Amino acid sequence: MLPFFPEPSLSYTQQNRTAVLLLNLGTPDAPTAQAVRPYLKSFLTDRRVVELPKWLWYPILHGLVLTLRPKKSAHAYEKIWFKEGSPLEVYTARQAAALAKRMPDLIVRHAMTYGNPSVADVLSELKAQGAGRLLVIPMYPQYAASSSGAAVDKVCEQLLLQRNQMSVRTVSRFYDDTGYIDAMKNHILRYWAEHGRGKKLMLSFHGVPQKHHDLGDPYPDECRHTAKLLAEALELTEDQYVVSFQSQFGRAKWVTPSTQDLFGKLPKQGVTELDVFCPGFLADCLETMEEIALMGREQFYEAGGKSYRYIPCLNDNPDWIDALVALAEENLGSWR
């Protein structure tokens, strides 16, 4: 039997507060190989992320990936690290702080599925503050088992250890949420007004293995639906935007088209002015700031591109905070 964690002895009225948890993927504590290795290990041993039997995957993971990749990843993190810390952690913390300011009757916190602040630590803190109800918002508009599913798993793992369990609601997806779409539209239009506009807009989402989609993961379909709604809001014709998937890992077939492949192909097709936005990322991170903003620019120019603009994520954009407040209010329902 699992041991239950000791909990504060609080009366019902003392456990009647409502909390909102913004849950993102995670980040190492520092841009060093020593910090990256345990982060990668926790991420890549999650059965939601790598759906291979342990006997096959673990020798590869421990023999190759965790030996070679930490140093390479640490170098990439060094390029984008803020003075305050990891961009993903910094921006997610700002989102939580902005939400807390708008909803002062609630306890609002953020946590990471992998790394710090951990779900275990934050839920313990919330329990100590008298939270008996918890709304979990995984910061992924489009549902994928390897992101949203893994985030909810972490919360459920902690519920298994609670003697007096919290009431929990989760937001599984919001890929077609009007506030989310409008926030992106306004953000992109403001960027174009200030920095100019390319001939084509690339909407790059994080990729998933094709097998995941074949087995029922709705993620690629939800990404394409988000892109369609955003393109319509921006009044783009079909030839003015393209949907792609980035961050492939390993040798398995992933959903296509590949963002990296398109960086090489588009200039040869006459597209030499490109803007790139990542709708599935609500906060800038390694995959957007290094892979797209830096490496993507280099790949596009090497292929013959002439103009490349990376449009930052929503981060703590006021329109996105408005949408986040509305999303929380809708899902809190009678808890408010």
From Swiss-Prot:
It is an enzyme of class 4 (lyase). Pathway: Porphyrin-containing compound metabolism; protoheme biosynthesis; protoheme from protoporphyrin-IX: step 1/1. Pfam families: Ferrochelatase. It catalyses: heme b + 2 H(+) = protoporphyrin IX + Fe(2+). One of its GO terms (molecular function) is metal ion binding. The keyword Metal-binding applies. Fe cation binds at H206, E287. GO terms for cellular component: cytoplasm. It is found in: Cytoplasm. Its main location: cytoplasm. Its EC number is 4.98.1.1. One of its GO terms (biological process) is heme biosynthetic process. Keywords: Cytoplasm, Heme biosynthesis, Iron, Lyase, Metal-binding, Porphyrin biosynthesis. InterPro entries: Ferrochelatase, Ferrochelatase_AS, Ferrochelatase_C, Ferrochelatase_N. Belongs to the ferrochelatase family. Catalyzes the ferrous insertion into protoporphyrin IX. PANTHER family: FERROCHELATASE (PTHR11108), FERROCHELATASE, MITOCHONDRIAL (PTHR11108:SF1). NCBIfam families: hemH (TIGR00109). HAMAP family: Ferrochelatase. This is Ferrochelatase. It comes from Neisseria meningitidis serogroup B (strain ATCC BAA-335 / MC58). The lineage of its organism: Bacteria, Pseudomonadati, Pseudomonadota, Betaproteobacteria, Neisseriales. The gene is hemH.
